[in-house]
Amino acid sequence: MCGRYVVKNPVTKTSKLVKSAIQVEDTENYNAHPYQKLPVIKKYKNGNTLEALKWGLIPGWAKDKDFKALINARLETIDEKVSFKKLIKNNRCVAVADGFYEWKREEKEKTPHYFTRKDTNPIFFAGIYEEDQFCLITEEAKDNISEIHHRQPVIINQTDVHRYLNLELQGSAFLKECNKPDLIFHEVSKDVNKPTNNSASLIQKV
């Protein structure tokens, strides 16, 4: 499960991918977490736009006021779940990031680790949205990531952003087949556990 990530200067990072940015500025967020408004790329007829959407999706059909917002959707079942099957077909988005956090469970403790691309390029998370909310798509952890956690966000290359947003392609099949970037990670301070902590020190190796 992906529940925290880092995003710095999203407007600059997506300048070659979008035509405009709406209510998004070049800021630095070292502890992006659910229920925050975060930069997401959406496709319109006249081009892509970078918008601020709330991380955590409550489907339109959910009438229970206590329904918990969904922050992740499993790639393996996204075409089957009533919450997601229409969204992966018609409402795809891409969240931009620099890296993300995962926690390794060790006996009674969980230790945070920070993941980035090995080539240092920006990270693009595949997602889905409904109105002003979005969630990230996850898959089984690959290679060394599984040492820390059994799930990971689906990450696509910048060259595949336009393809994923192309609704003529079958979204889940594309995500299963496309090339994924290599990731590296290191242990970080448990200060990241507190959502209100937000500084560059959170991503420093300990």
Report each predicted region and the residues it spans.
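Short linear sequence motif anchored by a di-proline
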Residues: 1-206
